[in-house]
Amino acid sequence: MARLGPTPFVNCVTAPEPEAARGGRETQEIRVSKTPPAVWPLSGFGDEIDPDPAVQAAVLLALGASHIEVRSAWGTNVSELEPEQVARLKEILDEKGLKVSAVASPVGKVDVSLPVEHELARLRQIISVARGLETKYIRIFSFYRAEGRSAEDIREDVLVRMGALAALAEESGVVLLHENEKGIYGDTPQRVLDIMESVNSPALRIAWDNANFVQVGVKPYTEGYAMLRPYLEYFQVKDALATTGEVVPSGEGDGELDATIAALKADGYAGFASLEPHLASAHELGGFSGPAAFGTAARAFAALAAKNQIELV
């Protein structure tokens, strides 16, 4: 499998106003963007809309999405879907004209004390689901710890497990996307970077989530973007309030969504933007919004995208 390099950065140049036009006035700086018009494929967590994949697909299509991120179908988590269910899900999505951007697995969303093989077995199951749905991306996490244990206490155990998961992924031709979930080892920019640098695998990249960083007291763009951008391959769209941690529509919280989106565009990002609103409820395996709230979240993000001259398709 070819090594995946970081998306190249694109700079801007500053042009002075022509001498004849200045008339003794101060030089006017004009920012000339060298970034081509951005087009981002739009996706979303279907089960935030409804348990029924047909309803999920209909709503996403109505909101202009071309893809869906699959976490569960008919109320069954992807880690427990039978082959027949995966085949039926693929049929439904094909009929609707939706492709799958990623499988949002629960791998790594367990205590680090469980044996390495526990999550490897679950990842093997998820890989079969990803193949059935024709996507290379699988969302994962970097393990919880028991009360009283520090992040440093579990670091080595986490890195062993993340390395084993990445090795299986690379062997299988898929790419793992680490989400910076609150409470896991990799919930701060510094520890996410530690995972990326320590594992050093082309099959382990970042699913960036602004809201999750806010919930652990981090200013996402200010404190984490430059550090993690070389590994950022997938954008999960969520915002949150710093005071309460409440998830809110894009641009209404403290997640620095506007700055992040502008920077991604300037850097030439062309990957998925996946809506994960969590506007009605959140729980251990995900969250729920319902069709109306999901639409609110989609429109809020679309407004920020339009402001930054990004076309969502």
What are these regions (language model features)?
Residues 2-10:
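Extreme N-terminal basic, low-complexity initiation segments
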Residues 11, 34, 52-58, 91-95, ...:
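Active-site acidic/histidine proton-transfer and metal-coordination neighborhood
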Residues 5, 23-24:
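Residue-identity detector for glycine
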Residues 70-93, 143-149:
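Glycine-rich, proline-tolerant flexible connector loops at the mouths of alpha/beta enzymes
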Residues 19, 26-29:
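Charged/polar low-complexity intrinsically disordered segments
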Residues 69, 102-104, 139, 177, ...:
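Conserved beta-strand positions in the central sheet of alpha/beta enzyme cores
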Residues 48-50, 72-74, 106-109, 142-146, ...:
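Active-site-proximal loop/turn and secondary-structure-junction residues that shape catalytic pockets
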Residues 11, 28-66, 94, 134, ...:
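Histidine-acidic metal/acid-base catalytic patches
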